[in-house]
Amino acid sequence: MLFLEEKKIIDKENVIGSNIRRIRLEKGIGQTELIRDLQLRKIAITRETLVKIEGGRQHIKLDQLRAIRDILQVSYEDLLQ
C-alpha cells in the first residue's frame, strides 16, 4: 500500500524500490549513472540514498520518483505495480 506524506511516498512493501532496481538493471544503467543523471536534473540524491530506496530502507520523494521515471523512460504504472 502506498501513501503520500509530505511529498514522500510511503511504500511499506518496497514495490517502488524493487521496480526501480529491476528496470534500471534491465536497461543496463548503473547506480552511479542514474545518480549522475538525477543530479544533472537538480535532484538532490546520493548513491547511498538510492541504495536505501532500492532496498526499502528509505522512502522516495515525489521529485525523485518523477525524475527516475523520466530517466528510465517508463510510466508511473511500471514503477508502482
Model-predicted regions and their roles:
Residues 61-78:
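DNA major-groove recognition helix of helix-turn-helix/homeodomain DNA-binding modules
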Residues 55:
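Short, conserved catalytic or interaction motifs in soluble domains
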Residues 28-52:
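Short alpha-helical DNA-recognition segment
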Residues 20, 31, 47, 62-65:
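Helix-turn-helix DNA-binding elements, focusing on the entry/boundary residues of the two helices
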Residues 1-27:
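A short, Lys/Arg-rich alpha-helix, primarily the initiator
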